Amino acid sequence: MNRREFTRLTSLAALILPRQKDWGLITDVNQLHPNAVKKQCIAAFKRFEQVWNFNDFWKRGNTFDACLVFADALHKKWPADKDVIAVLKSIDSMLEENYRYFKSFDAGKMWADDFGWWGLMAINARKHLLRSGNEVLADKYTKLSIELCWQQEKEHAYDFSDTAKPVPHGCRNGDADGQDKGVKNTVTNVLFFLLSCRIYRLLSTEKQTGNEQYLEMAYHQWLWFDSWFKLTGYGYLQQLGNDAVLVMERPTAFFDGSDYKNTTHPTWEKGWLWTGDQGMLMAALTELLNIKNDIAAWIMRNHADTGFNSAVFENSINHYIKSLAKGVNLGLIGNTDNIIREAPFKANFGPEFGNDYLAGRGILMRYMGQLGNKAGGVNFKKCITATAAAIWHTQDVVTNQFSPEFTSNESDELYAQQYRKLTGLGDPAMKWQIQAMNEQQKFGVCQSIGLDAFGALINQL
């Protein structure tokens, strides 16, 4: 996409820096004026208010999670600001509508990973609603997260058998009524991993009982990922050099008797990985680190793992977090513009499921922002700042609608070459092939990517 040079500057038209040809050059967060960033955030949210109420189950869960994390960052930075307070009040009523939307669906017709998105969003909704004093709706969202979303994944997606080869257990991304078993992909498993950790922490913080089953499932999901990571011959972790890795879209093992040979729904290609998985896996591992002592105590109490070593456990978690952070820094950020990119695979950008994978860059930034300035020992300030600037400077100047594309053709191709040089894999640079996507869905998802970027940016100020 050619960069648009606007002829008129307004107070909301720049990140307090002059316009440049390549907005990725804006990387110094210290040069930003917080009040200008706040105005941009308010403008971005007002557009989100106009486009968020579309009809697509999983996208609604994810985009509203972006909104809640963004709003939480706004509140922490400017708790007494009248415009921020107005945003928070608007979200109160939006959460009423979102709850009605969720309850209008037959849970048996939804895919397993849908419940992961809604479950995580519901935990953040509880936090927001308790802060605003709506305890009744907060409790409804808690039940939605635990008694419906988590329970659906446990009962209909988790594989309790010991027979799967080469790694048992894990979650299938099938539909909840069992008509389609689906594949054990990364997104379904990491969502259940992260959701189990967060439910356990929520219940523990609020001193509620009956929380051990969530701790147990978090540990089981850890074992599934750790087992795959140790089977280096199957390449579930894409090695980038210098102890940097990225996790693939799904683990595969092509041998007679393998339960991980499925290459459909969506169509798999060699080396394929997705930005969203990287952010969620770093977040899940970080959550696991926060409850490591509880896990160790539970294992000892229940004799659950005779080979468990707490020091090895902790070191392994830290190692994976650091390696993933290095992988993101090396493989998913353009060297020429510092902008966060989607991995260059047709499986991400193509017409089959591009409308789903479109949100990945935002999801990655959402968790980057939550993990702090040095996630895994890597400082992501420059890339978050550059990406937020790029998103802002390629918006529709009239509506403040963000675009699926916020990088130039030239830098896209340079990034694709950068990625192929690192991995020997990937496709040539391409645009998002989402022409068939419902327009309001597209607007809502693209706006949520911007909210994710600005939420992460606020945390850098």
Where are these regions (language model features)?
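N-terminal export signals
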Residues: 5-23
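CBM-like carbohydrate-recognition segments
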Residues: 23-113, 117, 137, 155-168, ...
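Aromatic- and glycine-enriched pocket-lining scaffold segments that form the walls
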Residues: 142-143, 148-228
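Mobile, glycine-rich extracellular loop/lid and propeptide segments
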Residues: 109-122, 142, 148
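Inter-helical turn/loop segments and adjacent helix faces that build the functional surface
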Residues: 132-133, 199-212, 288-299
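Active-site cradle of extracellular carbohydrate-active enzymes
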Residues: 196, 211-288, 325
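The core hydrophobic/aromatic register in alpha-helical repeat solenoids, strongest
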Residues: 67-70, 121-125, 196-199, 285-288, ...
